[in-house]
């Protein structure tokens, strides 16, 4: 179920503070965050945010199409190792 519109989007305060500081200074440094639950807001457009996937930080460049989505959607947590095709010769 989506979040109520009257509440507005959720963004962790420490992340929003870093984004606003960089907007004031005009810099575009990579921002590291563990906050996968934070929603992408218009102030983040053009920034690169490194989102933690449980093992490393995955750099995500924020575009207009990402507004309203959560940061965790762009950093997959599971790595899929393809199913190995069975070799018929080795079974005999």
Swiss-Prot record:
<dbReference type="InterPro" id="IPR005732">
    <property type="entry name" value="Ribosomal_uS19_bac-type"/>
</dbReference>
<dbReference type="GO" id="GO:0005737">
    <property type="term" value="C:cytoplasm"/>
</dbReference>
<dbReference type="GO" id="GO:0006412">
    <property type="term" value="P:translation"/>
</dbReference>
<keyword id="KW-0689">Ribosomal protein</keyword>
<dbReference type="GO" id="GO:0019843">
    <property type="term" value="F:rRNA binding"/>
</dbReference>
<keyword id="KW-0687">Ribonucleoprotein</keyword>
<dbReference type="GO" id="GO:0000028">
    <property type="term" value="P:ribosomal small subunit assembly"/>
</dbReference>
<dbReference type="InterPro" id="IPR023575">
    <property type="entry name" value="Ribosomal_uS19_SF"/>
</dbReference>
<dbReference type="GO" id="GO:0003735">
    <property type="term" value="F:structural constituent of ribosome"/>
</dbReference>
<dbReference type="InterPro" id="IPR020934">
    <property type="entry name" value="Ribosomal_uS19_CS"/>
</dbReference>
<keyword id="KW-0694">RNA-binding</keyword>
<dbReference type="GO" id="GO:0015935">
    <property type="term" value="C:small ribosomal subunit"/>
</dbReference>
<comment type="similarity">
    <text>Belongs to the universal ribosomal protein uS19 family.</text>
</comment>
<keyword id="KW-0699">rRNA-binding</keyword>
<comment type="function">
    <text>Protein S19 forms a complex with S13 that binds strongly to the 16S ribosomal RNA.</text>
</comment>
<dbReference type="Pfam" id="PF00203">
    <property type="entry name" value="Ribosomal_S19"/>
</dbReference>
<dbReference type="InterPro" id="IPR002222">
    <property type="entry name" value="Ribosomal_uS19"/>
</dbReference>
<protein>
    <recommendedName>
        <fullName>Small ribosomal subunit protein uS19</fullName>
    </recommendedName>
</protein>
């Amino acid at each position: 179920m989506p979040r109520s519109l009257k509440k507005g989007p959720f963004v962790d305060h420490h992340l929003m503070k870093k984004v606003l500081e960089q907007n004031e200074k005009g810099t575009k440094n990579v921002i590291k965050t563990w906050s996968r639950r934070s929603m992408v807001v218009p102030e983040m457009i053009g920034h690169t945010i490194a989102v933690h996937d449980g093992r490393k930080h995955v750099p995500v460049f924020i575009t207009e199409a990402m507004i309203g989505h959560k940061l965790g959607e762009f950093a997959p947590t599971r790595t899929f190792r393809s199913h190995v095709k069975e070799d018929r010769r080795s079974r005999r």
